């Protein structure tokens, strides 16, 4: 597989925003908007913290996750051709 990454993209993304305490907006499939910082996650849920309170959010209920600022997970591939 390409590079045999130890983690999948989802885990890499969640771990990055957790370690860097990046504020997120999470939209659920029912349209509810949640905001906070990821403090923990596993295969099934995400623990979101805001204003001293934690919310356990099941991943199957999540539609979209938007970080508060741009996130770069991987180094740019220098061998890839540049897009014009």
UniProtKB/Swiss-Prot annotation:
InterPro entries found in the cross-reference section: Hfq, LSM_dom_sf, Sm
Keywords: RNA-binding, Stress response
GO cellular component: cytosol
SUPFAM superfamilies assigned to the protein according to its UniProt record, in alphabetical order: Sm-like ribonucleoproteins (SSF50182)
SS bonds (residue pairs): none
Limits of the Sm domain: 11-71
Presence of keyword RNA-binding: yes
Assembly information from the UniProt record: Homohexamer.
Its biological purpose: RNA chaperone that binds small regulatory RNA (sRNAs) and mRNAs to facilitate mRNA translational regulation in response to envelope stress, environmental stress and changes in metabolite concentrations. Also binds with high specificity to tRNAs.
Protein name per UniProt: RNA-binding protein Hfq
Biological source species: Methylorubrum extorquens (strain PA1) (Methylobacterium extorquens)
